[in-house]
Amino acid sequence: MLPSNPVPTGTADNRRAVLGVIPARYGASRFPGKPLAMLWGKPMLQHVWERARVARGIDELVIATDDERIATVARAFGAGIEMTSLDCTSGTDRVAEVARTRPHAQVVLNLQGDEPELESAAVTELVSAMRADDTITMGTIAHHEPDLAAMASENVVKVVVDDEGYALYFSRADLAGASRGGPALRHAGVYAFRRPLLLEFASWPPGKLEQAERLEQLRAVERGVRIKVVLGERPFAGVDTPEQLAALERRGPQAVGAG
């Protein structure tokens, strides 16, 4: 493993240190080399890194990868790098591997490397929620989605929450009448964990709900973990295909805000 090059983005607090990790892999089956694909004049991964740096409250931010091509490009734009093993089968595995080397970290963020329009303000709110309430062991982000056609798609993950803002269920299906303006929210693939829960989560085998829905967060739901859902201002989606990337290129970027 090569030495890491962490870049601090806030004021470290050993009691509540927040570690942000952006997992990135080169060999995506639908879009090989996706993190390095150019978007608005920069590698897509750089947009994620820059938006994550704008978010407040993250004490250390690193990109986790097992590919030297990604590491080389990321170092060139100033990112901290953590080289992970080839054994990681998911982004969460990479995040957990980094977290094992950071025993001081209290909260660990999993920030997807294919979300170039990451909402910095929502990440700030998620970090604030985790810092403010030690009883929250896992958190995520969701948004109101006005595009009902999008909410009808199985490619869009929905979540319904209870009166206290905790997730009841996540699904790709038309959950709670989402396509008809029902109460379901559009889920964003950003997660915050207390470090002990993250390490435990990574050791759990996939559950039946996770396998049925193809949603990793249901592994926690099945185990009785309460997931706090922070409401963001505007939906943002990941890039899965070259066609989606081309559509973003044509449309242009949304504004960045730290909250």
What would you call each of these model-derived segments?
Residues 3, 14-64:
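N-terminal glycine-rich phosphate-binding loop and ensuing alpha1 helix
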